[in-house]
Structures are given as C-alpha cells and as structure tokens.
C-alpha cells in the first residue's frame, strides 16, 4: 500500500460576498474526511475562505505539497471556483486524482464531470466511508468498481455505483480533524468560533432543501457523551467560546436537546451557542434547558405567512405555531432569528407582503430574507425543470439573493426590490433600533448592514 498525500480544499471564491457577510465557519465536511484517512495517509486541509487565499496561493501549495489526491468541496454558487482548483491541480500534475463531494455534486455527478473534465470522480451523499474506500483503492492500485456512493469516469463515460447505505451509528465517525484547520481564523463578531454537527438526517422534505436526500430521512444522533467530548476539545484545546450547532433540527429529539444543554451546564463549559429548531419541535422545557446551557439564539425556519405557500413548501407548520414558538423563546430569554423565503413560482404580491408584515409582527430579534432558489436535488429544482422555470444554470447566481426562476406574478427586478424592502422595513424601525442600542449593543444594526450589503452587492 502506498501512503497517499491527500490535499482537501475549500476553494477561495472570486466573489466578495463571503467577506461582506462576515462569519466563516470551519469546513466540517473536509475535517470529517481527514479524520477517516489520516492514520494511514498524509493529509492536509486548505480553507481558502478563512485563509483569504488566491488561486495563485492554491497553486503554490499544490506544487509544494505534491498531492496524489485532491479532494474539493463547494456550495452550488462556488462550483466554478472548485472547477478552477481542479484545473490548477491537473495543470500542475496531470496524474493527480481529483474528487469532489458535497450536496451539489451529489445530485449532478454527470453534469459536474462534463462541466469540468478535470474532475475524475464524485463522492455522492454521506461521504466518509466512500472517500475512505476510494483512498484505499487508489493506494493499492485497485479498480474503483464496487465502491458504493462513487461516480467516476470509465472508458469516457460516467459510471454511477449504487448509493451507499447511511452510517447507522454516527458515533463511529471520528471527531473532525480540527487540528488540520486554521482554527484561529474562525471568529463570530471577534469571538473564537466553531461549528458542531450533533446529528444527521431529516425526516421532513421541504421543497427547497436537499438535506433529507443527502443525509437521509432517518434522524441519527450522536450520543450526549460524544457531543460533550467534541465541545470540550473545541473549548479547551482551541479556545472556542461561540458554537453553532449545524443540525437541521437540534430539537427534533427534545429529550436529547435537553440532555445536551444540561450537560454543557454541568460540565462548566464556558461557551455560548446557537441552534436551529422547527417551530413545532420547540416547547418550554426545551427552551428553559437551552437557555441554562448557554444558548442565546434559536434559528426558526418560519418561511411564510401564507398557509398556501407553507403547503407548497411541505413545511408542515402553521403561522400560529411560529407565533407560539417565538413567544416561548422570548419567555426564557432566548433571542429568535426567523428565516423567510419569498418568490415561490406562483406566490402573489399579497402573500409576499403578508410575509414581510408577519416578520415585523413577530417578536423576533433578527430576520433573514431570501429568494426561493431551486438547488439541484430539491423538489423545487424538479418543479422548475418540469415547468421550464429556470432563468439560468449559471451556478454563480444560486445565492438565494439572485432570482433564478421565472415567477408568475413578478419580474426578477420586482422580486429583488421586494427583498430589499423586506430588509429595510424590518430592521430600520424605531422599535428595533432602540432595542438594539439598549439590549444588543449594536449587533442587530451590524446584522442589518450585512443583510443589506448581501442584497445590494450580489455575488
């Protein structure tokens, strides 16, 4: 077996939007992959965003490290940056094996390798075991046939191996290789910042989300002990004081959410944190425990004030449940962030205006407004394709602030104008500004400025 030199890359981006928005979190997926293969191979991770690297910098690193394998991850809007890294790697060494992973390529393996012939393979879905088997095969000179979850080139065509079954006991996955990341670069408003995924899988199937297809509909959670171990490493070894839990729904298993929160308190971990919750998986017991455990903000996917649009989304919630969840959060001293999506295919102006009004009516501290975006793999993508709604397949536009679908009742300019109106009308209210000065020390103003910059200076 050959010891492989493996370079894992989160590409830099040509867009300034990442720098405008502020917080950049560690590329957790790459750190998981590294943890799976580092015992037998030489692994290096490049975070092009956090380290503010140029493509020229990437080229120099590749030349110096001389990897056998280059693994790249990217969001949909950063795919062209990933392609650039792949081309750089192949130009330096045509024999290097280039592989990509992530939600976008999971659902577009043939298209990805057609758009960028420098990519040799795509890891689909949950990637740890597939990547480990790929590295093992390459190190031993074996063929790739039979590696579940892998798509690769064979005789000029793309061969898609069958999907890989999901990892049932996620505690078997090693703790991410945080030591290979530039942990000192991750800050949230100047505070050392980290991200943790305590569970995988989502039993829901919202029209705009591919999570249940990427990580399965069956929820799989880490043990409380494993979560505390990972938090302790981040806090004591890297000085992390602010955590974002990346679970789709941290509160899906209420008892476990309570247990994790109380253990954080019992262990004396001096961290504050945020987490996402559905409005119908949140109650007073959960809110109380989360607050006691150091949580300061809960992210709610409220999406719309229109029951008709909520039904189209497949959200499975009501506006009243959103009102109740926000009230519960506020009762226990938690800040609430509401996420809202406008611009679904046949959404009316009255429905969009009602959603903006609803956001202001709710007692939420922060609001995030986006335009409905049909990402590959989602039901919204399938709907847009079936109804010929796509305006572009320029992935750079898939930012959630650029309109990429034809809408029945709006032009692209009109829905963009409504997005700007949503941010301005929510944040530039006397009630919000006064509350911000006395309770949030200007944090809401900072968030509003970031949101508005995202909208006005689109990627």
Swiss-Prot record:
InterPro entries: Cobalamin-bd (IPR006158), Cobalamin-bd_sf (IPR036724), Elp3/MiaA/NifB-like_rSAM (IPR006638), Methyltransferase_Class_B (IPR034466), rSAM (IPR007197), rSAM_horseshoe (IPR023404), Tetrapyrrole_Bchl_Biosynth_MTs (IPR051198). GO terms for molecular function: 4 iron, 4 sulfur cluster binding; cobalamin binding; metal ion binding; methyltransferase activity. Pfam families: B12-binding (PF02310), Radical_SAM (PF04055). One of its GO terms (biological process) is methylation. Binds 1 [4Fe-4S] cluster. The cluster is coordinated with 3 cysteines and an exchangeable S-adenosyl-L-methionine. Residues 13-145 form the B12-binding domain. The keyword Calcium does not apply. [4Fe-4S] cluster binds at residues 202, 206, 209. Its cofactor is [4Fe-4S] cluster. Its EC number is 2.1.1.-. It is an enzyme of class 2 (transferase). Residues 188-402 form the Radical SAM core domain. Keywords: 4Fe-4S, Iron, Iron-sulfur, Metal-binding, Methyltransferase, S-adenosyl-L-methionine, Transferase. The keyword Metal-binding applies. SMART domains: Elp3 (SM00729). PANTHER family: ANAEROBIC MAGNESIUM-PROTOPORPHYRIN IX MONOMETHYL ESTER CYCLASE-RELATED, BLL1977 PROTEIN. Belongs to the methyltransferase superfamily. This is Uncharacterized methyltransferase PH0819.
């Amino acid at each position: 077996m050959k010891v492989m030199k493996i370079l894992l890359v989160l590409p830099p981006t040509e867009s300034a939007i990442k720098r405008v928005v502020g917080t950049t979190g560690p590329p957790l997926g790459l750190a998981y992959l590294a943890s799976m293969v580092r015992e037998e191979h030489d692994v290096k991770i490049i975070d092009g965003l956090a380290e503010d690297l140029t493509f020229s910098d990437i080229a120099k690193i590749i030349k110096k490290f001389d990897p056998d394998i280059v693994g790249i991850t990217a969001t949909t809007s950063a795919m062209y940056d990933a392609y650039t890294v792949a081309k750089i790697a192949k130009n330096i060494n045509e024999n290097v094996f280039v592989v990509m992973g992530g939600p976008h390529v999971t659902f577009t393996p043939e298209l990805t390798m057609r758009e960028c012939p420098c990519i040799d393979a795509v890891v689909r879905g949950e990637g740890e075991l597939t990547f480990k088997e790929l590295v093992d095969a390459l190190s031993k000179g074996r063929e790739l046939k039979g590696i579940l979850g892998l798509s690769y080139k064979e005789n000029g065509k793309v061969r898609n191996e069958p999907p890989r079954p999901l990892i049932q006991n996620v505690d078997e996955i090693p703790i991410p290789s945080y030591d290979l990341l530039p942990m000192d670069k991750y800050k949230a408003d100047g505070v050392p910042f980290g991200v943790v995924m305590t569970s995988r899988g989502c039993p829901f199937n919202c029209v705009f989300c591919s999570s249940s297809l990427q990580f399965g509909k069956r929820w799989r959670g880490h043990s409380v002990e494993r979560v505390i171990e990972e938090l302790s490493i981040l806090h004591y070894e890297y000085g992390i004081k602010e955590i974002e839990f990346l679970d789709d729904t941290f509160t899906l298993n209420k008892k476990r959410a309570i247990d994790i929160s109380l253990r954080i308190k019992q262990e004396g971990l001096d961290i504050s944190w945020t987490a996402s919750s559905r409005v119908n998986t949140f109650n007073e017991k959960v809110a109380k425990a989360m607050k006691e455990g150091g949580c300061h903000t809960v992210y709610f996917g409220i999406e719309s004030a229109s029951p008709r649009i909520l039904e189209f989304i497949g959200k499975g919630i009501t506006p009243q449940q959103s009102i109740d969840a926000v009230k519960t959060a506020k009762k226990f001293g938690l800040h609430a962030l509401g996420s809202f999506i406008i611009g679904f295919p046949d959404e009316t102006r009255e429905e969009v205006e009602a959603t903006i009004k609803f956001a202001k009516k709710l007692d939420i501290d922060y609001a995030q407004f986006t335009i409905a975006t049909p990402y590959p793999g989602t039901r919204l993508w399938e709907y847009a394709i079936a109804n010929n709604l796509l305006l572009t397949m320029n992935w750079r536009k898939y930012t959630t602030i650029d309109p990429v679908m034809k809408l029945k009742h709006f032009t692209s300019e009109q829905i963009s104008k409504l997005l700007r109106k949503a941010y301005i009308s929510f944040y530039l209210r006397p009630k919000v500004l006064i509350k911000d000065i006395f309770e949030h020390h200007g944090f809401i103003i900072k968030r509003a400025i970031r949101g508005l910059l995202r909208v006005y200076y689109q990627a």
